Each structure stands twice: as structure tokens, then as C-alpha cells.
Regions:
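Short acidic beta-strand-loop surface patches of small beta-rich interaction domains
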Residues: 43-47, 52-59
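Structured interaction patches on ligand/partner-binding surfaces of diverse proteins
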Residues: 66-77
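Acidic, glycine-enriched active-site microenvironments
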Residues: 8, 51, 66
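Long, low-complexity segments enriched in small/aliphatic residues
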Residues: 597-672
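Non-catalytic alpha/beta scaffold blocks inside enzyme catalytic domains
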Residues: 348-613, 665-672
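N-terminal export/assembly segments and adjacent metallocofactor-ligating motifs
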Residues: 2-27, 35, 39, 55-58, ...
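Short, glycine-/polar-rich solvent-exposed loops and beta-turns at beta-strand/coil boundaries
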Residues: 38-47, 69, 182
Length: 672
């Protein structure tokens, strides 16, 4: 039986799903309904009353369009479709009244409010309100909350829409915000005055329709109309969240989420949102050469000449690909190093990932598959630290009835999970069981780097792949590096390469700051920040950060995405691919591309699937050879969410958040 229902909205008859609310039906008809409390990704509260519409033939009063479904409408005379009016005199009068009530206690802070220029209350007061107020009584005042270093509160501006409460409870999975009191005495507050303990809390800034919750680090720095807005991709984890980079002059002022149903919906992690101050600190803005044990500033010809001299004289040459390197730079490095007889490696954490089997390193599931899964298994991972937005999607599936199982040490998750066991050998035990019942349900297995960086990582990956095959589950590999899948796609690996790198006498380090390079080798470091890699370098070539050059990144599910340049690199720093092209000229082996466009053409010619931007290819590959899984508990490789890369480690705000997280953990252990 069809669930489609006919309905007449402002004189236009349309056919919609009966389960839709009236506000959704109006959107289907192309009619915008004002709202404050309603949000399509949160539960329905129905408390702002701004979305009132007139239902002809219904009760003689306006109806809240966010809370009434189409199937509940009474048909018209002789079975005619129900009629809805969104712009009748009754509706206009109701909206004016609601707006007047909302503004009764609202302060006239617009000139000094950070929300000014992008405020729903401003826009809707202009569109649906009146130009005078009948209220002559004193306005109420409330104390501001201390929610931590990220969210600044101005609670006199709050209209009690409860979006922040619903987000923290339903999506972030914490219960530290709530509403107390009734009527004029109602207010949003935190539990016992606690600061928020979530790495997704910054999203309540976007959700707040007024200026009650604003960004504390961004406060009073810029107005929305002063900013240049650029669509790009996040690289703080391997999910590849869609983001907007707002810049003022040459500086990045803030990051905001963009809607992408297949990846991040419209949420981003706090590291993604607030790491921008790390782009301003500890930057490499000029080349350096080490002489007599100390680094000195050099010119580009000097630095490139010194690097070329070392490469030409190398008996064993190796290249390392860091966690934030775009595909273009990785592809260029591979051609440069292999052209000089060297090897290139992107698996700098020792992950046992086969570069010739895309189904094994990019998985067979999509992020979107998690939403519909009835069973989810986590192997050697803590998604709350490794990919907070992915963790929110797992929580979303859990709230819809999915069962979550964990193999490995039990992490502190935001949902209930069945701890199957900590030992990796449990995978072998599970393979011996009958999975016919599970195979009938949609399910996803998520494997983390905590499992794959072990010495038996290849055996664990083969076991997880076999388990996915037995249960007819999708396999998702949760990488911790944004560059990893793209680097594997272009073949930036080599058998036994980590052993070869240990023996190399010249190492070209493309932003790999997460490993220690042994003494003795001559190190050429190309990167954006003065982090661990730069401290070990003999030559430093300053490169652009991810907001300062166009770059291709492939996320954990194998989706190619483009990061767009939003600003320019500081000082004499250059785009990463251009540095490698210039160095190839010094080596008399000039790479065959002289622009970013020609480089991308070469990449797509060699790897056609990378030309399908924002599409997830169906990953294929042979079953991996089974190996012996050793005893031992699986643990996550990420222990400090806020300090996982050089940009984050340069951020003062990330350092503060890291210290706060450690203090909370210490307090919790002391309480036990």
C-alpha cells in the first residue's frame, strides 16, 4: 500500500510521503517555513511555535508544522486533499505574535553580537516580525554559563529552542546540558556547572539560532561579510569532512561544516573547527640548511642545490609520505624518488596494508552504510578519538536499534557496546561459529590501526576480511591519516620498505612527523611546521598547509575529494608539488608536468578512479592469505585526540584541550 498522500499547499497540489511533517512537505513544495527549534537532524521539540501554519478544516487555530504529520491531516469535503496555508492572515498574525514574545526579553546586542549578519533571529524578525514592541516591563537577565574554552555563552540572548540540549544528548552522547524552570523562569544550564566533555561540542555554535552560544576563540575578530568563504576538505582525520574555510586577508579565521550526507552530515569535530590557530604558529616560512650542527636560513637555490647534491650521492634513497600530504605531492614524490633509484613509503606507522588490494585498505563499506546497519563490530579502534563524527554516526545507528560489539580494550564510547573480548585471537574463534543469522542483517565491521600496526596486523586484517565475508558484512578500515588511502592508491609503498628506510643514507621526508628517524641518515624535510621532522632535518624545504594549496585527498572509504586553496603560504613557503618539480630540475630529471592541472591529468591517467570526485568506487580485491594471529589485547593507536599532527601540536587551543582531557581522566581515575 502506497504511503503517498496528496496535499494542497498555498493552492499547489503535491504528492508526498504521509510520514513527512508539514514543514517537510512545505519544503518539498519549495516553500520556506520559518523555524527556530526545528532541525532536521534532531528530535522534534515544537516549542518555538515560529513554524505555525493554517490547516483548513482543522481546529480553528494555527498548527505547528514541525510536529504534525501529513497522514494526520483531515481530508477536505468529499475526500478532497487537505489544504494548508502558509501565508494567510491568521498565519501572519500568529508569527508576529510569536516573534513579539521571543523578543520580549532579548537584549539589543546586535551591534556587538558575533552572530550579527548570520543570525536567524535577525533575519526572521525582519521578515515576519513587526517594527515596534508593546512590552514596557524590565527584561529578565540570566547568568552566563562556563562551558569551557570553546563555547562562549550569552544566556540573556537565549530563546530556549533547546537545540543545544538535544544535540549534546542525542548526537554527542553526553548529558551535561539541560533545561530547568518553567515559563519565563526556564533556562538552559549545565549539570552542576560542569564544562562540556565532548569533542563535538562546537557544533552547538552552528545550531544556536541566536547569539547565545558563540565561538570563544573567534569572538570579536571578524564580521561574516568581511570573510572570503572557500569550500574544502578536512584533514584532521581520515573521514574527509566537508568544510568551509573563512579567511580574512591571508589568515584563516574559522572553519565551519558543510552539509554532506554521505560523510559528515553537517557535523565536524572540535579539532577540525578550532585548529586554525595552529596554522599561524611554528610555521616554516624559509628554507634552512644545517651547518656545524645548527640550522641556518638559506635561499631556495641553496636549499634545492644541497638537497639535489645529497640525493645524487645517495647509495640508498628513501622517501616518506606524511599524514597530511595531498595525492599530488605524493605522486610527484614517488616519481622523483623512484626515478633516482629509491623507494617510497606512506605506511610510516607500520600498518600492514596491501597496496595492491583496494578492498583491503579502503574497505567494502561506505560511511553511509553505518546508518542502516543492524550490527556493528569495532576491532582495535576507538572511533570516539580516531574519528568523532564517525562515532556520532555509529551512535545514531545504535539509537535506531543497532547492536555494537567491541574486540579490543573497551574504549569510553558514547553508546552501549557488547565487549566481546580484548584479545585479538577472538577473531579466530568467531570464524569458527555459524553466522547465518547475522548474515541476514545489514552489518559493518570497522577495523582500526590499533589492530593493523601490530606485527600480526596482516593476519588480523585477513581474519577481519574473512569474518566480513562469512557474515556478509561491509568492511571499513578506520585510518588515522588523511593521506593514507590516496597514497596507497598511487602505489607509494614498497615491500619491506621500513627495513630499507632504516638502512637508507638519504631520506626525503614529506611531512612525516610521527616517527623517529635514526641517526646517520641525511634528512631532507618538506613540510609546513617546525615539528619533529624539521628538528631532525639537514635541509628544510617549507611547504604549504592544506588550506594554502589545492589538493586531492581520498577518505577512508575511498572517496576522492578536492581541497581548495583558501589562503597563501607564509613567507617563502611554496606549494608542495611545485617544490618537488623544482627539485627534479636540479637533478636533471624534470618531472613531466608544469602546472597543478597537468599533474592531476597525469594522476587520473595512471589511476582513473581518482578522477571521479566525491564518488565511492566499488572496491574489489582478492581474499588475503590467512596468517597466525598472536595473543594480546588490541588497543587504539590514538591516545591524545587533540595532538595527532603538526598543525594540531602548534595550536595553543589544542594544547589547552589536551591538558583538560588529561585532567578529566586523572580526576576520574582518582574518583575510582
Amino acid at each position: 500500500m502506497s504511503n503517498l498522500r496528496k496535499v494542497v499547499i498555498d493552492g499547489n497540489e503535491i504528492e508526498v510521503d504521509g510520514a513527512l511533517t508539514l514543514i517537510q512537505a512545505c519544503e518539498e513544495a519549495g516553500i520556506e517555513i520559518p523555524r527556530f527549534c526545528y532541525h532536521e537532524r534532531l528530535s522534534i521539540a515544537g516549542n518555538c511555535r515560529m513554524c505555525l501554519v493554517e490547516v483548513v478544516g482543522g481546529p480553528p487555530k494555527p498548527a505547528a508544522s514541525c510536529a504534525m504529520q501529513v497522514k494526520d491531516l483531515r481530508p477536505g469535503p468529499e475526500g478532497a486533499p487537505p489544504v494548508i496555508k502558509t501565508n494567510s492572515p491568521m498565519v501572519k498574525k500568529a508569527r508576529e505574535g510569536v516573534m513579539e514574545f521571543l523578543l520580549i526579553n532579548h537584549p539589543l546586542d546586535c551591534p556587538i553580537c558575533d552572530q550579527g549578519g548570520e543570525c536567524d533571529l535577525q533575519d526572521q524578525a525582519m521578515a515576519y516580525g513587526v517594527d515596534f514592541s508593546r512590552f514596557r516591563e524590565p527584561k529578565r537577565a540570566t547568568d552566563d554559563l562556563d562551558l569551557g574554552p570553546l563555547v562562549e555563552t550569552h544566556m540573556t540572548r537565549c530563546i530556549s529552542c533547546t537545540r543545544c540540549v538535544r544535540f549534546t544528548t542525542e548526537v554527542a552522547g553526553i548529558t551535561q546540558m539541560g533545561q530547568t524552570g518553567r515559563g519565563e523562569d526556564s533556562e538552559i544550564t549545565s549539570y552542576l556547572g560542569e564544562t562540556l566533555d565532548s569533542n563535538l561540542q562546537g557544533n552547538i555554535i552552528d545550531l544556536c539560532p541566536v547569539g547565545a552560544l558563540v565561538s570563544k576563540p573567534y569572538a570579536f575578530t571578524a564580521r561574516p561579510w568581511e570573510l572570503n568563504k572557500t569550500e574544502s576538505v578536512d584533514v584532521m582525520d581520515a573521514m574527509g569532512a566537508s568544510i568551509r574555510v573563512d579567511t580574512k586577508g591571508r589568515e584563516v579565521m574559522r572553519f565551519l561544516p558543510l552539509n554532506h550526507d554521505g560523510v559528515n552530515e553537517e557535523w565536524i569535530s572540535d579539532k577540525t573547527r578550532f585548529v586554525w590557530d595552529g596554522l599561524r604558529r611554528q610555521r616554516l616560512d624559509t628554507p634552512y640548511i644545517r651547518e656545524n650542527g645548527k640550522l641556518r636560513k638559506a635561499t631556495w637555490p641553496e636549499a634545492l642545490g644541497k638537497a639535489a647534491e645529497a640525493i645524487k650521492g645517495a647509495t640508498s634513497l628513501a622517501g616518506l609520505v606524511g599524514d597530511l600530504a595531498p595525492v599530488e605531492a605524493t605522486f610527484a614524490l614517488k616519481q622523483l624518488i623512484e626515478g633516482q633509484g629509491g623507494i617510497v613509503e606512506c605506511r610510516t606507522d607500520g600498518a600492514k596494508l596491501p597496496s595492491d588490494n583496494r578492498a583491503a585498505y579502503a574497505g567494502t563499506a561506505t560511511i553511509d552504510d553505518i546508518d542502516g546497519a543492524e550490527a556493528i563490530m569495532l576491532i582495535g579502534t576507538n572511533p570516539r578519538l580516531e574519528a568523532p563524527v564517525l562515532n556520532a554516526r555509529i551512535r545514531k545507528a545504535w539509537t535506531m536499534g543497532a547492536n555494537v560489539g567491541v574486540i579490543g580494550e573497551m574504549p569510553d564510547l558514547t553508546y552501549e557496546a557488547n565487549h566481546i573480548g580484548a584479545d585479538a585471537t577472538i577473531i579466530d574463534d568467531l570464524l569458527k561459529r555459524d553466522h547465518s543469522e547475522v548474515a541476514e542483517k545489514p552489518s559493518v565491521i570497522v577495523v582500526g590501526m590499533g589492530a593493523l600496526t601490530r606485527s600480526d596486523g596482516a593476519a588480523i586484517l585477513a581474519g577481519a576480511q574473512a569474518l566480513a565475508e562469512a557474515t556478509k558484512s561491509g568492511l571499513l578500515i578506520l585510518h588515522t591519516a588523511a593521506s593514507r588511502v590516496g597514497a596507497l592508491d598511487v602505489g607509494a609503498t614498497n615491500p619491506d620498505s621500513m627495513a630499507a628506510i632504516d638502512k637508507a643514507d638519504v631520506i626525503y621526508n614529506l611531512g612525516a612527523d610521527e616517527l623517529e628517524i635514526s641517526d646517520g641518515a641525511f634528512v631532507i624535510y618538506q613540510g609546513s611546521h617546525g615539528d619533529r621532522g624539521a628538528h631532525r632535518a639537514d635541509v628544510i624545504l617549507p611547504g604549504a598547509a592544506y588550506t594554502e594549496e589545492g589538493g586531492l585527498f581520498v577518505n577512508l572509504e575511498g572517496r576522492p575529494q578536492l581541497a581548495t586553496r583558501a589562503s597563501f603560504a607564509p613567507g617563502e613557503a611554496k606549494e608542495n608539488w611545485a617544490i618537488l618539480r623544482a627539485l627534479s630540475g636540479e637533478l636533471d630529471a624534470t618531472l613531466p608536468f608544469d602546472s597543478l592541472a597537468s599533474l592531476r591529468s597525469a594522476i587520473v591517467k595512471a589511476h582513473p578512479h581518482l578522477g571521479n570526485i566525491d564518488e565511492v568506487a566499488e572496491n574489489t580485491g582478492n581474499a588475503l592469505a590467512k596468517g597466525k594471529i598472536a595473543k594480546g589485547a588490541l588497543t587504539s593507536t590514538v591516545t591524545d585526540f587533540y595532538l595527532t599532527n603538526p598543525i594540531a601540536r602548534a595550536s595553543q587551543l589544542m594544547a589547552e584541550l589536551s591538558a583538560n582531557a588529561k585532567a578529566r581522566k586523572t580526576e576520574a581515575m582518582a574518583a575510582e
